[in-house]
Regions:
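N-terminal helix-turn-helix DNA-binding module of bacterial transcription factors
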Residues: 1-73, 350
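Short acidic/polar active-site loop segments enriched in Thr and Asp
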Residues: 27, 73, 134-135, 195-198, ...
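Hinge/beta->alpha junction and helix N-cap segments in small-molecule ligand-binding domains
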Residues: 81-94, 112-120, 175-185, 201-248, ...
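Short, well-structured alpha-helical segments in soluble
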Residues: 121-133, 243-256
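Flexible loop/hinge segments that line or gate small-molecule binding clefts
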Residues: 140-185, 267, 293-305
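Flexible loop/turn connectors
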Residues: 248-350
């Protein structure tokens, strides 16, 4: 038989106050008094119980019912695990800015939810869902734990995933950019240029076999009779500094041949351009560079970056409409909606 702790970690059962009290070694009455703020509980015991309640995401049934029946007008935004800051992840800054505008226009506030360690007994995401503090969730994470998906479905939390595909479930609403088609367009375009070597710069937290951008790029090159060599896939963290270092570490590749480079995103592409400039590689004569997303910085720097423009405003607006419809009780079948990126040619390509 599973222990209470094991059942709770699986995320399938809502814990009663009796079970919680048994798990942490105090009486049910003490749990109730402590979490209701009664002065009869000593400070040390109250702090211990509150700490354990936070650890396990436990709330009293009376608190949960009150929160459940009260609309909070707050939407949680679940950020990726690799998220560092809005200043370094400018695509998320761009999306988040549009999201704030859309939700504010509809009189909703935002709560950012971010987990450093999703494998802990009850992570922030799960605790917030169980607490009833949110009317719904917007997700930016490409992966959820199975216990998290089970919890969303069990509690019927209005949930919409934006920008990234959730690999684990076809039962959730997903709105995303067609990254494979974007990669295909870039591959087909560069495949028609006077290029001897094709390069793809990937991110280190996305396995190549799961990269829609890479798959599309390879298909686009193949449509032009060209091939991406196995030794032409570079990997870096999601930052311009890491992309710069990756190019410098493989400098011979760019100095010997005419290259066509597809970089995972615009910020990394700016790092690639800095490295090429330092190596004396002329852009676009000796190296042509494509980014992805068309963040505002892509057109502000010199040379201006060629990229794929993601229809962020439309995607975010549709996502907010869908989420609020779910919150208001509309029966909407789970679906996946793809948005097509548009090629924007600037100074880094011919």
């Amino acid at each position: 038989m599973r222990s209470l702790s094991e059942k709770w970690q699986e995320g399938l059962d809502l814990m009663t106050s009796r079970e919680f009290a048994e798990l942490i070694g105090v009486s049910q009455a003490t749990v109730s008094r402590a979490l209701n703020g009664r002065s009869s509980v000593c400070e040390k015991t109250r702090i211990y119980i509150e700490k354990k309640a936070e650890e396990y995401g436990f709330v009293l049934n009376s608190q949960a019912r009150s929160l459940k029946t009260s609309k909070t007008n707050t939407i949680g935004v679940l950020f990726p695990l690799n998220f560092d800051s809005l200043s370094k992840n400018l695509m998320f800054t761009h999306i988040f800015d549009q999201l704030q505008r859309e939700l504010s226009r509809r009189s909703y506030d935002i709560m950012i939810v971010y987990d450093h360690d999703p494998e802990m007994k009850s992570n922030t995401f799960e605790r917030v869902i169980r607490s009833g503090k949110l009317d719904g969730l917007i997700n930016f994470r490409p992966q959820l734990l199975q216990r998290e998906i089970d919890l969303i479905e069990k509690l019927r939390i209005p949930f919409v995933s934006l920008h990234s595909a959730l690999q684990e479930s076809s039962m959730l609403h997903q709105l995303m950019i067609d990254e494979e088609n974007a990669g295909f367009q870039i591959g087909a375009y560069l495949g028609g240029q006077d290029v001897s070597r094709y390069v793809y710069m990937a991110v280190d937290d996305e396995p190549p076999e799961r990269s829609a951008r890479l798959h599309g790029y390879m298909k686009g090159l193949a449509s032009a009779g060209k091939v991406l060599g196995e030794d032409s896939i570079l990997t870096a963290e999601r930052s311009p500094e890491a992309a710069y270092e990756a190019v410098m570490a493989s400098s011979a590749m760019f100095c010997r041949e005419r290259t066509g480079i597809f970089v995972y995103n615009d910020m990394m592409a700016l790092g690639v351009l800095n490295a090429l400039r330092e190596l004396g590689v002329a852009v676009p004569d000796q190296a042509q560079v494509f980014g992805m997303d068309d963040i505002p910085l892509a057109s502000w720097f010199t040379p201006r970056l060629s990229t794929m423009r993601s229809p962020v405003r439309q995607m975010v607006g549709d996502g907010c409409d869908l989420l609020i419809g779910l919150i208001e009780g509309e029966e909407i079948a789970p679906r996946t909606t793809y948005y097509q990126a548009q090629m924007v040619l600037r100074d880094t390509t011919r």
